[in-house]
Structure formats: structure tokens, C-alpha cells
Design a protein with these regions (language model features):
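Hydrophobic/aromatic beta-strand patches that form the interior of the parallel beta-sheet core
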Residues: 88-90, 144, 168-170, 214, ...
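Glycine-rich adenosine-cofactor-binding loop
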Residues: 131-176
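A structured beta-alpha segment of the ubiquitous adenosine-cofactor-binding alpha/beta core
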Residues: 199-234, 239-242
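ADP-ribose/adenylate-binding Rossmann-like module
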Residues: 234-268
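Short amphipathic alpha-helical segments
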Residues: 156-158, 181-182, 247-250
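Glycine/serine-rich phosphate-binding loop and adjoining beta1-alpha1 elements at the start
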Residues: 1-141
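Short amphipathic alpha-helical segments and helix-helix/interface helices
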Residues: 75, 199, 225-226, 248-253
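Glycine-rich phosphate-binding loop and adjoining beta1-alpha1-beta2 segment
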Residues: 172-207
């Protein structure tokens, strides 16, 4: 099975525009699956997998044709401590503004070329939804979600999948054991603030989304609640507590804003 390397198109373009000829990045492998995700900029969400060194190198037309030799030469010049694990080397070539790349996995001097696949630019990420959803309109919308249990959390992820570009998340609670059976988060996120865990889930679906988080009890900070309601195009009220629902509703009425109310059974 050929290894596969995933590269962000935006990262490649930004690297080329910077004028650098070489830079170090980070790579993460799904152990045993020969799948590697490589980054020039460290991702917003901590990647899954085992980390390893990664190096990006710009090459001319002649060297691009013999990129394997270039990769071996680059590998030979790397410090010995970097060679204790496999290394991903990406050779980048630009012709007529088109950026192309070849990727190699080098392990103890042995080299194998990988299949390169690209994570698309922001403008292309939701092309399959065009015609079904108004993706362009949703990208500019801001949604406030108060309460990130088994109701609010999946709503946040579904909105991210639909192409909503801006989120405000509000919840003071943490992921607890009793949440796991029905929540989008798993046991590896026990103890995390729900706002941070759900933010990561959003960014895994839409890495270009803008996400603000407030790990507060909004009943005690009503000024922040009112500010967030005022900024948002839609407020999702997914709390299971009467005082918070009353306080949010009062601000929705005061500001003439739209809100959707829903709740799950206790302990969800």
C-alpha cells in the first residue's frame, strides 16, 4: 500500500508567497495506516497521530523531475537526532503560478514516494453543498450557542458542516463521565471545558471558522450575554436551566433578535 500525504493548499501557497526556499513543519502519522498529515503552520486543533519531522523544500523544474534525489540529499543534511524517526520531505515546484508537490517518507535512509492529496482552500471546502445550501450566505453569519450538552454540541457541529463561519460558544461546564454516552465528545476529552472541546470539533469540520468561547455562568455575567446576543444573527438556547432560558429570552426580546429554544432530559 502506498503511503498518503495530506497537505493544506493554503499552507503551500503561503509558503511560496513568503519567498523562503526551505522550512521545517510538522507531520503526524496514523500509525500502521501509512497516512500522514503535514503542516507548515501548526494546526488550531491538536492533531491525532504520532509526530515526526517534516521539511518543505522549493525546487526548480530540473530538480522536481529528480525530487527523490533532492529528498535524500536534504535528509542527509539533517541533524542525526531528527533521523531517529521517519521524516516527511515535501518538494514544491511552481510553474505559471500553479503549485505542485511531491512527498517522500525517509526512514533510516530508505525512501518511498507518497501519494499527495490536498486539503482544499476555504473557497472550495463546501463545494459539494453549493446548490443545496446557501454556503456563501452562511459563511458570514454568526451563531451564539448557549449550553453545549448533548443538544447544543451536535447543533454546533452540524452548523459548521453547513458552512456557518462564526460561532460564539457559552457554557461553564466540563465534560463529565455521565455526558459521554450521548455527547459528541469521547472519554479522551473528560475534564475539558465544553467550550474548548466543541470549538475543536467545529474546527475539525471547518478549519476556517472563527470561534469565540466563554466558559462563564451567563446568569452572573448578563452584560457579556447581552453583548453576545447583540452580535449574533441567531441564538441557540440549549440550556437545561430555567433562569438562563429566561435571561436569554429577555435579551432576545429587548434586542429584537431571533432565538431557537430546545433542551434535552437532565444529565444529558
Amino acid at each position: 500500500m502506498e503511503p498518503i500525504v495530506y497537505i493544506y493548499q493554503d499552507h503551500l501557497q503561503d509558503f511560496w508567497n513568503s519567498g523562503q526556499s526551505q522550512c521545517f513543519g510538522a507531520a503526524f502519522e496514523w500509525k500502521g495506516e501509512q497516512v500522514y498529515h503535514v503542516y507548515i503552520k501548526y494546526p488550531q486543533v491538536a492533531p491525532t497521530g504520532y509526530s515526526m519531522p517534516c521539511l518543505f523544500r522549493v525546487v526548480d523544474t530540473d530538480d522536481y523531475g529528480k525530487a527523490e534525489d533532492v529528498a535524500l540529499s536534504v535528509y542527509a543534511s539533517m541533524p542525526e537526532e531528527a533521523k531517529r524517526v521517519p521524516v516527511v520531505i515535501v518538494c514544491i515546484h511552481v510553474e505559471d503560478t500553479k503549485v505542485s508537490s511531491r512527498a517522500f517518507i525517509v526512514d533510516d535512509g530508505r525512501i518511498i514516494e507518497a501519494v499527495v492529496k490536498y486539503v482544499p482552500r476555504k473557497s472550495e471546502l463546501y463545494t459539494r453543498s453549493k446548490g443545496l445550501l446557501e454556503v456563501g450566505a452562511l459563511e458570514s453569519k454568526k451563531v451564539l450557542i448557549v449550553g453545549l450538552g448533548s443538544g447544543g454540541a451536535p447543533i454546533a457541529v452540524e452548523l459548521a458542516k453547513a458552512g456557518v463561519g462564526h460561532f460564539i460558544l457559552m457554557d461553564f461546564d466540563r465534560i463529565e463521565l455521565h455526558n459521554i454516552a450521548r455527547h459528541i465528545c469521547g472519554v479522551n476529552e473528560l475534564g475539558r471545558l465544553k467550550v474548548n472541546a466543541v470549538k475543536d470539533a467545529i474546527l475539525l469540520k471547518n478549519p476556517y471558522a472563527q470561534v469565540e468561547t466563554y466558559d462563564i455562568d451567563m446568569n452572573k455575567q448578563l452584560d457579556i450575554l447581552e453583548k453576545c446576543v447583540a452580535e449574533s444573527d441567531l441564538t441557540i438556547v440549549a440550556t437545561d436551566e430555567y433562569a438562563s432560558r429566561y435571561n436569554i429570552n429577555a435579551r432576545l426580546v429587548k434586542l429584537g433578535k431571533v432565538g431557537l429554544f430546545g433542551r434535552a432530559i437532565y444529565y444529558a
